[in-house]
Amino acid sequence: MIFATDLDRTIIHSSKFVDNASQVKCIEILDDKEISYMSHLSIELINKIKNNPSIQLIPITTRSYAQFKRVQPVQNLPYAVVANGGIILHNGEPLPEWEKHVDSICRRLEDQYTNILKLLNQYKTHLTKEPVLIDDIFFFTKISDDKTIINYIDEAMTRE
């Protein structure tokens, strides 16, 4: 059986979602700062799944490869899917076949990156994070006003 799970806000949480510090353990540190936590129960259950030979745990996340490697409880697994599906890890290393496939797609679309950034910058006042290219695969940003973006998408879809 496969047990696939997202990471952020599913089995791991930032400090703003931690109500009781005694019920969690820090599982990610960046620049000497604790940034992510898991409940003791979640850690126990993940370890049970990892140690059960009939279940294969596969973490799936939007996190970059570097961000994923900081999350200790989900390391040393046969498979993981990171970078929004752009990287498939096998025993902690990117699968070369998938990497080659994704790279060929990204190279074909590379000339569109400027247009994508231009589009994102039209909504700069609604962004809380500067757009960034993750692992040379996809753009990531955060928005403050999702209604504006949803309206834009609705308008774009009706024009098609």
PLM features per residue range, with description:
Residues M1-F3, L7-Q56:
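Active-site neighborhood of HAD-like aspartate-dependent phosphohydrolases
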